[in-house]
From Swiss-Prot:
Belongs to the AIR synthase family. The gene is purM. One of its GO terms (biological process) is adenine biosynthetic process. It comes from Colwellia psychrerythraea (strain 34H / ATCC BAA-681). This is Phosphoribosylformylglycinamidine cyclo-ligase. It is an enzyme of class 6 (ligase). The lineage of its organism: Bacteria, Pseudomonadati, Pseudomonadota, Gammaproteobacteria, Alteromonadales. The keyword Cytoplasm applies. It catalyses: 2-formamido-N(1)-(5-O-phospho-beta-D-ribosyl)acetamidine + ATP = 5-amino-1-(5-phospho-beta-D-ribosyl)imidazole + ADP + phosphate + H(+). PANTHER family: TRIFUNCTIONAL PURINE BIOSYNTHETIC PROTEIN ADENOSINE-3, TRIFUNCTIONAL PURINE BIOSYNTHETIC PROTEIN ADENOSINE-3-RELATED. GO terms for molecular function: ATP binding; phosphoribosylamine-glycine ligase activity; phosphoribosylformylglycinamidine cyclo-ligase activity.
Length: 346
């Protein structure tokens, strides 16, 4: 007589549907706080439905997706899960606003080997907070429990955002011309880029991240949430004819500023117009990193660069400062000669 086989369940295979349901219940309140009047329906459907906002003559949709890179590795190692969701939203919505788009709705993807409801809830609370800061609705997401795909305790997140803009007011850099001026928006820290190098610096120095730097733990400097610029920049766009915006992410100054400039334009940066926040000086010193590599990897304290007409500098800084930004005159646009770089320091 053959031995009776054990009856297996999905939970035996490592997927706990009840835990997933518990997560949905936990996050309902956070999701509800992000709602916009255009959103139709709530969580639980196969898809999310959203109307276009009123007031647009010829609306176009702008979409973006991103993650937070290996900043997540550091956050997991330090058991700091409540702010990476803000980072996730910031990386997406800041990419939309540089094209002149108002973020409309956001979806997230959370993948892990075994779902920890408390950890996942904390992450989603952060996502909801990022959505509130940027004025977009968290309309859905996917939680994937995938045994065998991740190490115990690890997870990964990705975000997807859709925004709306007036077609005639899309910002693509084509209006940038010599004589335009550059305005910087201060960063809150390294944001969500360069963390593989940051983690290498921590490793080779055997750094205790509880060590204080100017009265603040190094861990807190590094994990400070990415600044969300949406509401202040939207206000600027109502008042000033902005010619271009650049979100300073992976690739730093050298890679991101040229993305929004005509090939004939050159950004001339006033290197003495600001001081690097202390965490960047600490990273450069402890990693023996060249200045060129710093500007290629990190934002060095500048989270966004805005190109405006020369006669709009004072007004732009006034509007941005009134809406909570640390804004200053960073430089200007010049004609680029053959063979010259598109970003130079004066």
């Amino acid at each position: 007589m053959s031995e009776q086989k054990q009856s297996l369940s999905y939970k035996d295979a490592g997927v706990d549907i009840d835990a997933g349901n518990a997560l949905v219940e936990n996050i309902k309140g956070a999701v509800k706080r992000t709602t916009r009047p255009e959103v139709m329906g709530g969580l639980g459907g196969f898809g999310s439905v959203c109307q276009l906002p009123t007031g647009y003559k010829e609306p176009v949709l702008v979409a973006g997706t991103d993650g937070v890179g290996t900043k997540l590795r550091l956050a997991i190692d330090l058991a700091k899960h409540d702010t990476v969701g803000i980072d996730l939203v910031a990386m997406c919505v800041n990419d939309l606003i540089v094209q002149g788009a108002e973020p409309l709705f956001f979806l997230d993807y959370y993948a892990t080997a075994k779902l920890d409801v408390a950890v996942a809830s904390s992450v989603v609370e952060g996502i909801a907070e990022g959505c509130i800061q940027s004025g977009c609705a968290l309309v859905g997401g996917e939680t994937a429990e995938m045994p065998g795909m991740y190490h115990k305790g690890d997870y990964d997140i990705a975000g997807f955002c859709v925004g709306v803009a007036e077609k005639s007011r899309l910002i693509d850099g084509t209006n940038v011309a010599a004589g335009d001026q550059l305005i910087a928006l201060g960063a809150s820290g390294p944001h969500s880029n360069g963390f593989s190098l940051i983690r290498k610096v921590l490793e080779v120095n055997n750094t205790d991240t509880n060590e204080l730097l100017e009265g603040k733990k190094i861990a807190d400097h590094l994990l400070e949430p990415t600044k969300i610029y949406v509401k202040s920049v939207l206000e600027l766009l109502k008042n000033v004819d902005v010619h271009a915006l650049s979100h300073i992410t992976g690739g730093g100054f050298w890679e991101n500023i040229p993305r929004v400039l005509p090939e004939t334009a050159q950004a001339v940066i006033k290197g003495d117009s600001w001081q690097w926040p202390s965490i960047f000086n600490w990273l450069q010193e402890n990693g023996n990193i060249t200045e060129h590599e710093m500007y290629r990897t990190f934002n060095c304290g500048v989270g966004m660069v805005i190109v405006v007409p020369a006669d709009k500098v004072a007004q732009s800084i006034e509007v941005l400062t009134a809406h909570g930004e640390n804004a200053w005159h960073l430089g200007e646009i010049a004609d680029k000669a053959d063979g010259e770089e598109q970003v130079v320091f004066a």
